[in-house]
Amino acid sequence: NIPEILELKRKSLKSIAETTSNKIIISSSTSGFMPTELQKDMQFPERFIVGHPFNPVYLCPLVEIVGGKETSDNNKNIAKNFYESMGMHTLMVRKEVPGHIADRLQEAMWREILHALNDDIATTGELDESIVYGPGLRWSFMGMNQIYMIAGGKGGARHFIEQFGPALEWPWSHLKAP
């Protein structure tokens, strides 16, 4: 496990690339760096991917697979098959973006948690309970989009927004970083 220091990661990945067969896929679990940044000085950069898992990995099967500008589609698919052979659920991230997908969603919630703490709305324990015993249970089997499709009835998420959108304006305006 290499610390999240760009130059250290690049140097380590370059060394790994120089000492392994060009048929070996090299992966990093980073969520802080873009694959294109990391594959910059590597030999055969087409074999580099980010395979970003979630902890604890024995409970959270998601692995986000992100390729850089030089990563081949074939190598992304090989990585996908490898992770799936271990029982992981893969998500092919369409483009490089800081934090990939799931961490970005998690960070949006984290910002709201920091606001709630800062505004003395709840304690850390109360905030965790509000997730663990509330939407966290639902999120374990339904994604946010599916929830709002169902909540909107026959009209789906569009109807939900039309019906409840005005009441959501205040919370949406509060989601800026504290």
Predicted segments, located by residue:
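Conserved Rossmann-fold dehydrogenase catalytic segment
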Residues: 84-108, 122-128, 142-148
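Rossmann-like NAD(P)-binding element
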Residues: 1-25
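Rossmann-fold dinucleotide-binding core
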Residues: 2, 25-95, 99-104
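A general alpha-helix detector
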Residues: 61-62, 109-113, 143-144, 160-163
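Interdomain hinge/lid region at the active-site interface
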Residues: 136-178
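C-terminal regulatory/interaction module of P-loop NTP-utilizing enzymes
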Residues: 115-123
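Glycine-rich beta-alpha junction loops
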Residues: 31-33, 54-56, 96-99, 131-136, ...
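Short, well-structured alpha-helical segments that form the helix of a local strand-helix-strand
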Residues: 79, 123-134
